[in-house]
From Swiss-Prot:
Top-level EC class as recorded in UniProt: transferase
Catalytic activity of the protein: uridine(54) in tRNA + S-adenosyl-L-methionine = 5-methyluridine(54) in tRNA + S-adenosyl-L-homocysteine + H(+); uridine(341) in tmRNA + S-adenosyl-L-methionine = 5-methyluridine(341) in tmRNA + S-adenosyl-L-homocysteine + H(+)
Active site: 317 (nucleophile), 351 (proton acceptor)
Domain of life: Bacteria
Protein name: tRNA/tmRNA (uracil-C(5))-methyltransferase
Keywords: Methyltransferase, S-adenosyl-L-methionine, Transferase, tRNA processing
Length: 359
């Protein structure tokens, strides 16, 4: 695969045209386009291991053929740190039976700030020999090492990496736990955060955030409003978000572990939730809602919930479901801002953002 600028520009223009066509029925403005580095943009990578000629190799499989491995020596789309670590880790397992025995998968997680973690997955219990070898590996490579085996986990160092991103002239620190979702393209993520920060603007009222994850958007957006009520269902993400709020001294956010559907019931006073004890929903003066839903988009009830708000800031990883949600809201809201974020260069996937404002 070649990574030349001309091919990249052609692919990016195709994505812009696709987004433009999907949003054309809603009189959307021309999208702002945020491009990606051509290489070394991906901060995480996962490889299976494949034995050939008595040696284990990094391997991946194409979506069309799950049986034939593609052996990998380097991975140009991954961060420079991952590419530096790959041969050193391979040399380490080749020289160490405790590290290599029944090792079947390796995961790397890195950050723009230079932090790194390696997860090693095994088809066997981990013993003291593994622990000693993994501790030496962590020291040699200056990384945290996680060992996984049948639901058990051994941690050498930390079970998270720390990312630092600049938004609106302020640097935010993010704890990103092993196994939790993080944005894979750090450079584009930072551009996306700054776009959302500018799109929301300085406000005197409150923000509702659905699907807040580890607080990726929550931290900078909280500095633009009076108060934030944020929801997330993943316990790992909730704990990371709480840690990130504390670490960054952001004290105007209340985080509740509810699904978007449950929050809709709570706001409609359908039934009480124990997890909302101590939260006075009537004290909020919501002017805006921020949503970053999964690929399926918002379900119809959640979409109706967002209609209550004058401003809907929507980040989408699936432009088709974004368009379907906008179609539901189009009679009351219009697109005033639109953006394409090329989180996934060299694929057909794209991230997009819109600001919908009440007519």
């Amino acid at each position: 695969m070649t990574f030349d600028a001309a091919s990249y520009t052609t692919q990016l223009n195709d994505k812009v045209a696709r987004l433009r066509d999907l949003l054309a029925p809603f009189d959307a403005p021309e999208p702002q386009v945020f491009d990606s580095p051509l290489q070394n943009f991906r901060l995480r990578a996962e490889f299976r291991l494949w034995r050939e000629a008595g040696e284990r190799h990094y391997a991946m499989f194409s979506q069309d053929d799950k049986r034939t491995p593609i052996l990998i020596e380097e991975f140009p789309i991954a961060s420079q740190r991952i590419n530096q670590l790959m041969p050193r880790l391979k040399a380490a397992w080749q020289a160490s039976a405790p590290l290599s025995h029944k090792l079947f998968q390796v995961e790397f997680l890195t950050t723009l700030a230079g932090d790194a973690m390696i997860t090693l997955c095994y088809h066997r219990p981990l013993d003291e020999h593994w622990h000693k070898a993994a501790s030496q590996l962590a020291a040699d490579l200056k990384v945290s090492v996680i060992g996984r085996s049948k639901g058990k986990r051994e941690v050498i160092g930390q079970d998270y990496v720390v990312e630092k991103l600049e938004v609106g002239g302020r640097t935010f620190s993010y704890r990103q736990p092993e196994g939790a979702f993080t944005q894979p393209n750090g450079t584009v993520n930072q551009k996306m955060l700054n776009w959302a920060y500018e799109a929301l603007g300085e406000r005197q009222d409150d923000l509702l955030e659905l699907y807040c994850g580890n607080g990726n958007f929550t931290l900078p957006l909280a500095t633009r409003v009076r108060k934030v009520l944020a929801t997330e269902i993943s316990k790992t993400s909730v704990n990371a978000a709480l840690s990130n709020l504390s670490e960054n001294a952001v004290d105007n956010v209340t985080l509740v572990r509810l699904s978007a559907e449950e929050l809709t019931e709570a706001l409609n006073e359908v039934r009480p939730f124990r997890r909302l004890q101590g939260v006075d929903l009537k004290s909020y003066e919501f002017g805006s809602v921020f949503v970053d839903p999964p690929r399926a988009g918002m379900d119809p009830d959640t979409c109706e919930l967002t209609r209550r708000f004058d401003n809907i800031l929507y980040i989408s990883c699936n432009p088709e479901t974004l368009a379907a949600n906008i179609a539901q809201l189009h009679d009351t809201h219009r697109i005033t801002r639109c953006a394409l974020f090329d989180q996934f260069p060299w694929t057909h996937h794209m991230e997009s953002g819109v600001l919908l404002t009440r007519r």
